[in-house]
């Protein structure tokens, strides 16, 4: 079965974000549906809530079936001590849609988050399906990443899949954060669900770390990076001028401040780095930038 229209994950009460999404998609004459994001509570309350939070009745039926089949995954995610509450809710929201893709036999799903900004000619990619069907087998395990996080990443050029609308399908070979926009094949949805079924709760990671980092080097699992990208998170595009607050980002920043106790070697290395920075801050910054960029590039947004 062909996929449904573009799905945007959004909390039901996120008024400003929903206005933002409506403006973005309507400006491109794109149809879309909101998927009410999973709100972290106790697992039993959340399951009952999730059944009622959906795009339409058919999706409710799919979610009900998915939950009945996947309680172990939901409980594992809830028990994770690594993830913040926001990260748990985000992962489960994406997971429920992957389950929908499999249970309703969709060839693929186009999934977005409610802080996405769409670029030039995004409608050509998101309104049409022929370019997808002529280039990809949806039984294969692949994700097409439509987004850039504007971070240095390793990309492998390939010639098997031709460009479309002057954008290449490069193969992602390193971490690339964010899940604001991607297309997942049914084959990939099955693979990621099966992966989650077979790992303990202490190995569960955030959704972007899972599909765009942890699995990137796995054989037969391919992430195609659309290059240049057709979408970006509003926070990444506008930085300090961002108007859409992110509770998830605040949680992550708070967690990053909780530092682990360092070894003597690590402390001495840090002291050395501080001295170098103090003596020649500009030179040190340039060295760090060059080191980070070796063999990498920043995927442009346009």
Curated annotation (Swiss-Prot):
Sequence repeats lie at residues 42-45, 46-49, 50-53, 54-57, 58-61, 62-65, 66-69. Keywords: Glycosyltransferase, Repeat, Transferase, Virulence. Changing residue 29 to N: In strain: DL42 and RM 7004. The keyword Nucleotidyltransferase does not apply. Residues 42-69 are annotated as: 7 X 4 AA tandem repeats of S-I-N-Q. GO terms for molecular function: glycosyltransferase activity. It is an enzyme of class 2 (transferase). The keyword Transcription does not apply. Signal peptide: none annotated. Its EC number is 2.-.-.-. Between 2 and 7 copies of the SINQ repeats are to be found in different strains; these are thought to serve to generate phase-variable expression of this gene. The (SINQ)n peptide may form a random coiled structure that permits appropriate interactions between the N- and C-terminal domains of the protein. Belongs to the glycosyltransferase 25 family. Involved in extracellular lipooligosaccharide (LOS) biosynthesis and virulence expression. Involved in the synthesis of the oligosaccharide moiety of the LOS molecule by adding GalNAc. This is Lipooligosaccharide biosynthesis protein lex-1. It comes from Haemophilus influenzae (strain ATCC 51907 / DSM 11121 / KW20 / Rd). The gene is lex1.
């Amino acid at each position: 079965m062909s996929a449904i229209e573009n799905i945007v994950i959004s909390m039901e009460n996120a008024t400003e974000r929903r206005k933002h999404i409506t403006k973005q998609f309507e400006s491109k004459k794109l149809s879309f549906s909101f998927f009410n994001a999973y709100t972290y509570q106790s697992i039993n309350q959340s399951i009952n809530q999730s059944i009622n939070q959906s795009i339409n009745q058919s999706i409710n039926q799919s979610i009900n079936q998915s939950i009945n089949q996947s309680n172990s995954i939901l409980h594992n995610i809830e028990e994770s001590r690594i993830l913040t509450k926001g990260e748990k809710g985000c992962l489960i929201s994406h997971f429920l849609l992957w389950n929908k893709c499999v249970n309703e036999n969709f060839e693929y799903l186009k999934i977005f988050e409610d802080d996405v900004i769409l670029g030039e000619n995004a409608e050509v990619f998101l309104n049409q399906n022929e370019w997808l069907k002529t280039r990809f087998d949806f039984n294969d395990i692949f994700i097409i990443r439509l987004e850039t996080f504007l971070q240095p990443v390793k990309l492998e050029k390939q010639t098997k899949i031709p460009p479309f609308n002057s954008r290449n399908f490069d193969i992602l070979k390193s971490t690339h954060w964010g899940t604001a926009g991607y297309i997942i094949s049914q084959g990939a949805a099955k693979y990621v669900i099966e992966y989650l079924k077979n790992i303990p709760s202490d190995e569960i990671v955030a959704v972007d770390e899972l599909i765009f980092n942890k699995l990137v080097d796995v054989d037969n699992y391919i992430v195609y990076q659309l290059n240049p990208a057709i979408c970006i998170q509003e926070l990444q595009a506008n930085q300090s001028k961002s108007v859409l607050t992110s509770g998830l980002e605040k949680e992550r920043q708070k967690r990053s401040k909780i530092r682990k106790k360092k070894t003597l070697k690590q402390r001495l290395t840090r002291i050395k780095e501080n001295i170098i920075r103090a003596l020649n801050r500009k030179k040190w910054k340039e060295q760090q930038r060059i080191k980070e960029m070796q063999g990498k590039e920043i995927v442009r947004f346009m």
